[in-house]
């Protein structure tokens, strides 16, 4: 297992993170998974034995049950120096202040997460989604308070747009407050929109990148083929995240993953994960599952290195279109492109 610095921090995290959205099985999250305590204990040990040192969860996952189970598994102790990341923003109750990124909600939810996780500190506390009604100054100040109180060590964001991130970083700099060290984003061979703004920002601003749903909800695992959706998948259960806008492109990507996997003697899922782990700007990919074999298979991706030729084959079926203003930069600015620019435009120069 390789360990990488998380953004502009001294914290090193494994290139694979254990995700926990399948743990708990409460409410709408039952569509994703129903992993109980005994299974979760086994999966945590499996990940830690493989060298994983970061577990990612959220208060909203199964209405707190995911955090509670992880807290029970860890037993108030940190096995093998494991780091805990969690998130807050979504509504946890019916009241008007039970959601969002206000000082009121963030501080109360952080304290609730600490209790559920049976710990006195959260290593990475992430705002789970944008809140356009709470001033960023208030959100950043609340996070800064939590760090200064010793309840949180590092802060990050999730599902922010490019301008959201840059505004937040500007607020932190202007007010001399804690700064996001990472962003958690959706990024796969099928969904490469992050390459327009989010990956360049990560490179330019030294932000860590944690990738959620790196297999597109299992669509890139190789189990889904043209005209075939296996039983028991989250798509059949009504979980429509992530959206697929071009099915033909998806199947071309899956076909290429299957072909490369067969040539290498590995699984398509391992190829898809290895592609991400090897992408510039990516710090760690978050894996999850309902079965032990899913974890075992995904963990093996940590040691798989794709060749340049294999990467070119995957690019050929998945490169995102060069939209404005990038096509104009490609035409008129390619003599002075920087490292962050080339993360998107490099294949076209």
Region locations from a protein language model:
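Short, well-ordered coil/turn segments that N-cap beta-strands
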Residues: 11-16, 51-53, 78-82, 119-123, ...
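Generic structural signal for well-ordered alpha-helices
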Residues: 44, 67, 71, 110-114, ...
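Glycine/proline-rich, positively charged
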Residues: 27, 32, 93-197
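N-terminal binding-site loop/beta-alpha segment at the start of enzyme catalytic domains
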Residues: 1-82
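Glycine-rich beta-alpha junction loops
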Residues: 88-90, 161, 187-191, 213-220, ...
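Aromatic-lined glycan-binding groove of carbohydrate-active enzymes
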Residues: 194-232, 267
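Terminal-tail/helix-coil boundary detector
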Residues: 204, 228-263, 278-282, 296-349
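Conserved, mostly hydrophobic/aromatic
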Residues: 6, 18, 55, 70, ...
């Amino acid at each position: 297992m390789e360990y990488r610095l998380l953004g502009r921090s001294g914290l090193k995290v494994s290139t694979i993170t254990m995700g926990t959205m399948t743990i708990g099985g409460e409410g709408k999250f039952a569509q994703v998974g129903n992993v109980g305590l005994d299974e979760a204990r086994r999966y945590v040990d499996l990940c830690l034995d493989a060298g994983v040192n970061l577990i990612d969860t959220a208060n909203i996952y199964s209405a707190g049950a995911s955090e509670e189970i992880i807290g029970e598994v860890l037993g108030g102790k940190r096995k093998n120096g494991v780091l805990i990341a969690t998130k807050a923003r979504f509504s946890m109750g019916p009241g008007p202040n039970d959601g969002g990124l206000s000082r009121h909600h963030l501080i109360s939810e952080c304290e609730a997460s600490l209790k559920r996780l049976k710990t006195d500190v959260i290593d990475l506390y992430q705002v789970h989604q944008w809140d356009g009604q709470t001033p960023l100054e208030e959100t950043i100040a609340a996070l800064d308070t939590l760090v200064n109180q010793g309840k949180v060590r590092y802060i990050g964001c999730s599902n922010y747009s490019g301008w959201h991130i840059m505004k937040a970083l500007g607020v932190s700099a202007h007010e001399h407050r804690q700064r996001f060290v990472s962003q958690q984003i959706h990024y796969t061979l099928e969904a490469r929109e992050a390459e327009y703004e989010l990956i360049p920002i990560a490179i330019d601003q030294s932000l860590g990148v944690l990738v959620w749903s790196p297999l597109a909800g299992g669509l890139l695992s190789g189990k889904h083929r043209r005209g075939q959706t296996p039983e028991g998948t989250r798509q059949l259960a009504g979980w429509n995240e992530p959206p697929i806008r071009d099915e033909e492109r998806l199947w071309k990507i899956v076909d290429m993953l299957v072909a490369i996997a067969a040539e290498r003697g590995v699984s398509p899922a391992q190829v898809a994960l290895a592609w991400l782990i090897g992408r510039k700007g990516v710090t760690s990919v978050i894996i999850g599952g309902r079965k032990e074999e899913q974890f075992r298979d995904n963990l093996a991706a940590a040691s798989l290195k794709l060749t340049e030729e294999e990467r070119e084959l995957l690019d050929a079926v998945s490169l995102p279109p060069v939209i404005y203003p990038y096509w104009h930069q490609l035409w008129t600015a390619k003599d002075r492109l920087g490292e962050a620019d080339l993360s998107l435009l490099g294949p076209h120069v």
